[in-house]
From Swiss-Prot:
GO cellular component: extracellular region; synapse
Biological function: The pigment-dispersing hormone causes the migration of the distal retinal pigment into the proximal end of the pigment chromatophore cells and thus decreases the amount of light entering the retinulas. May also function as a neurotransmitter and/or neuromodulator.
Name under which the protein is recorded: Pigment-dispersing hormone A peptides
UniProt keyword terms in alphabetical order: Amidation, Cleavage on pair of basic residues, Hormone, Neurotransmitter, Secreted, Signal
GO terms of biological process kind: chemical synaptic transmission; response to light stimulus
GO terms of molecular function: hormone activity
Expression sites (tissue/organ): Optical ganglia of the eyestalk.
N-terminal signal peptide: 1-20
UniProt cross-references to InterPro entries, sorted A to Z: Pigment_DH (IPR009396)
Amino acid sequence: MRSAMVVLVLVAMVAVFTRAQELKYPEREVVAELAAQIYGWPGSLGTMAGGPHKRNSELINSILGLPKVMNEAGRR
């Protein structure tokens, strides 16, 4: 899904840049600024996904609500 979004953004940027060649200078600045914002948008999605990645055992323990002490006791 993410690759589809990147392709869509790239197609939109190509369309904007081909039309931008026909624009006057102030309009070209606006288009360049919008393209830069669109280009930075997919990178910001990764920061919304969550914090650090967890191992499967950490995910299971957090879902089950097991205390960390019990988790460490099982490893000994």
